[in-house]
Amino acid sequence: MKFLVVFASCVLAVSAGVTEMSAGSMSSSNKELEEKLYNSILTGDYDSAVRQSLEYENQGKGSIIQNVVNNLIIDKSRNTMEYCYKLWVGNGQHIVRKYFPYNFRLIMAGNFVKLIYRNYNLALKLGPTLDPANERLAYGDGKEKNSDLISWKFITLWENNRVYFKIHNTKYNQYLKLSSTTDCNTQDRVIFGTNTADTTREQWFLQPTKYENDVLFFIYNREYNDALKLGRIVDASGDRMAFGHDGEVAGLPDIFSWFVTPF
């Protein structure tokens, strides 16, 4: 009887050891797959990244995708946007919906959105007045939170392995554009709404970031690499003019980042 008890204990111990080894091996294997997917995205091999993601999802290994997406955002990787876009157009919309923050889906689907500057909690709009070139100045609205004045949508453009966006104001049917001239003191550039979008001054790219558990975006102009921001001066309506910022912003998400929320 004593022999049987000892034998049973040995069997249980061996089984437990095998289980632990199996779990450890699986964890190690998943970590390697995460690194492979992350590196494919960082090197711009998006077709491979999409193939891997579809395969992992079919195998029930979605946690790999989720961890990679989380790490990309924490690391402020611009390539997150390209990866998301290639999934969206490459039979991976279900992956975007399942593993990416909701605002990524809003952007890729071209849904109507609000762009809210985190620092001042003001929504981007175009002013009512046309200049001689039929352009309107862009502002952060000091009062409005819900009217179509602050309704925008992103229009995607893929070029040279990068995704860019035309940012379209649905109220005035104009596109966000960065001025070619700079302020003599700050070197910042004024931002307008314009009727056409046929140059890189009307194209923008996004860099995701995370701050205080919120997923936000830096919004950069393709032509000048200036980041979209709101100025410090408040006019009589409580509005602030929009500018392209001349300088580094990635280390200051609390000041220069934007919420993208449903309209």
From Swiss-Prot:
Chain's gene name: LP4
Note: This lipoprotein belongs to the group of structurally related '30 kDa proteins' that comprise major protein components of the fifth (and last) instar larvae and of pupae.
Subcellular location: Secreted
Protein name according to UniProt: Low molecular mass lipoprotein 4
Species this protein is from: Bombyx mori (Silk moth)
Database matches in Gene3D superfamilies: 2.80.10.50, Lepidopteran low molecular weight (30 kD) lipoprotein, N-terminal domain
Tissue specificity comment: Detected in larval hemolymph (at protein level).
UniProt KW keywords: Lipoprotein, Secreted, Signal
Cellular-component GO terms for this entry: extracellular region
Signal peptide stretch: 1-23
Domain of life of the source: Eukaryota
Family: Belongs to the 30 kDa lipoprotein family.
